[in-house]
């Protein structure tokens, strides 16, 4: 698994599981809002009043409406504390 994926997947998965509202800014400046319903290697399914499939290559920034617990986004948090 690529290093980018090892950070990206736990972050998006925590947003999905906790149903945290997010703002997604696209590279063209458009702001999308909703909840992460699902994601894969190439797209994020964003749900608001409708579901939108957003290609990751078009995304600049993902901003959660509230902070995520560090353990939720770092699968190796326990290992880091023991070192």
Curated annotation (Swiss-Prot):
CDD domains: Hfq. One of its GO terms (cellular component) is cytosol. Pfam families: Hfq. Disulfide bonds: none annotated. The keyword RNA-binding applies. GO terms for biological process: regulation of DNA-templated transcription; regulation of RNA stability; regulation of translation, ncRNA-mediated. Transmembrane segments: none annotated. PANTHER family: RNA-BINDING PROTEIN HFQ (PTHR34772:SF1). RNA chaperone that binds small regulatory RNA (sRNAs) and mRNAs to facilitate mRNA translational regulation in response to envelope stress, environmental stress and changes in metabolite concentrations. Also binds with high specificity to tRNAs. This is RNA-binding protein Hfq. It comes from Pseudoalteromonas atlantica (strain T6c / ATCC BAA-1087).
């Amino acid at each position: 698994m690529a290093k980018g994926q090892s950070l990206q997947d736990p972050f998006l998965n925590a947003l999905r599981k906790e149903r945290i509202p997010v703002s997604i800014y696209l590279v063209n400046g458009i702001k999308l809002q909703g909840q992460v319903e699902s994601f894969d290697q190439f797209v994020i399914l964003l749900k608001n009043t409708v579901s939108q499939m957003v290609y990751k290559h078009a995304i600049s920034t993902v901003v959660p409406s509230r902070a995520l617990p560090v353990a939720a986004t770092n699968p190796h948090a326990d290992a880091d504390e023991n070192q």
